[in-house]
Swiss-Prot record:
Keywords attached to this entry: ATP synthesis, Cell inner membrane, Cell membrane, CF(1), Hydrogen ion transport, Ion transport, Membrane, Transport
Gene name per UniProt: atpC
Organism domain of life: Bacteria
Coiled coil: none
Primary localization: membrane
Name recorded for this polypeptide: ATP synthase epsilon chain
Gene3D superfamilies (alphabetical): ATP synthase delta/epsilon subunit, C-terminal domain, F0F1 ATP synthase delta/epsilon subunit, N-terminal
Gene Ontology MF term list: ATP binding; proton-transporting ATP synthase activity, rotational mechanism
Record's bilayer topology term: Peripheral membrane protein
Family membership noted in the UniProt record: Belongs to the ATPase epsilon chain family.
Species in which this protein is naturally found: Desulfatibacillum aliphaticivorans
Subunit structure: F-type ATPases have 2 components, CF(1) - the catalytic core - and CF(0) - the membrane proton channel. CF(1) has five subunits: alpha(3), beta(3), gamma(1), delta(1), epsilon(1). CF(0) has three main subunits: a, b and c.
HAMAP family: ATP_synth_epsil_bac (MF_00530)
Amino acid sequence: MAGNILLEVVTPEKIVVSETVQTVTAPGSEGEFGVLVGHTPFLATLKLGTLNFKDETGKVRAVFINGGFAETLPNKVTVLAESAERRCDIDADRCRLALERAQQRLESKENAVDFERAKRALARAQTRMSLAESRKMDGFQ
């Protein structure tokens, strides 16, 4: 595995990614970070965002991450995510519906708890939608 990293993205439901990659860029809670083979070991919390990686052929691929943790070792990155979806698996129609529901909940302003949940739902929907739309524009997976 010279020059490559094993990337594993796992949720409570399934293994989303388990493959050898060249690089990983993740949405850390303290800022985005990149990993190459031989990286110093560390743990990081992840925020909602896009995890990008370059596969063995050099193709850039992306995964939606809804928070979690990343363990980085010299030749392996393990992401434990609350939820995750490959860009190619995101359903743009479902994203649009989730976006509309979140916007309606924000406009209703029923109570503070619902308002905060609606803000988080809106951020998730916007990130997923952005990723789904970028798939169409750039052909990436």
